[in-house]
A protein has these predicted regions:
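Short helix-terminating capping/connector loops at secondary-structure junctions
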Residues: 68-69, 170-172
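P-loop NTPase switch module centered on the Walker A-proximal segment
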Residues: 1-102, 141-144, 150, 154-163
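Detector for methionine-enriched segments
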Residues: 30-34, 47, 122, 134, ...
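Conserved C-terminal guanine-recognition region of P-loop GTPase G domains, centered on the G4
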Residues: 93, 98-171
Length: 172
């Protein structure tokens, strides 16, 4: 999990842990399970990368019928978002095949977002964009459905522009 500070990486990790039965779904987003150090819990930020292995079952469906179930193991690394701990992100990225890029829908692409996207690009990681904190569009910004849709499109365009810049620089 990579992204800017306070975009919800640790809370998202909690949700994945809850889906695996490691913590209760009610505690997800509050317990910050991956922030196991006392100073991380006190400050409310991740300072060291933490890893956990999760298992997921995926049903194979062929022509509407379940053909079987595949088991997958996902090694999840929750990384810090603060610039002071960017070496933790670099180290974690070198251990991974892919990355979930967590972006707060209201904050959008921030400086550390660009940095972690660049790190993922340089390390050849397959990235998946996770748009987080969707409730803020309604509770804080009070957007209509059409305005929220437009905001999401803008965010995706921002991310694509950043990655497109990396591609253009690599081609020169």
């Amino acid at each position: 999990l990579i992204g800017h500070v306070d975009h919800g990486k640790s809370s998202y990790a909690d949700s994945l842990l809850a889906a695996n039965g490691i913590i209760s779904s009610r505690a997800a987003g509050q317990v910050r399970y991956m922030d196991s150090r006392e100073d991380e819990q006190e400050r409310g930020i991740t300072m060291k990368s933490s890893a956990v292995s999760l298992t997921f079952k995926l049903r194979k469906i062929q022509e509407g019928q379940v053909e079987g179930i595949d088991d997958y193991t996902l090694n999840l690394i929750d990384t810090p978002g603060h610039v002071d701990f960017s070496s933790e992100v670099s180290t974690a990225a070198r251990l991974c095949d892919g990355a979930l890029v967590i972006i707060d829908v209201v904050e959008g692409v921030c400086t550390q977002t660009v940095h972690v996207l660049r790190q993922a690009w340089m390390d050849g990681l397959r990235t998946v964009l996770v748009v987080n904190k969707m409730d803020r569009l309604i509770t804080e910004l009070r957007l209509t459905p059409n305005e929220a849709h437009h905001r999401l499109l803008q965010l995706i365009e921002q991310v694509n522009a950043v990655i497109g810049g990396f591609y253009a620089a690599a081609c020169m």
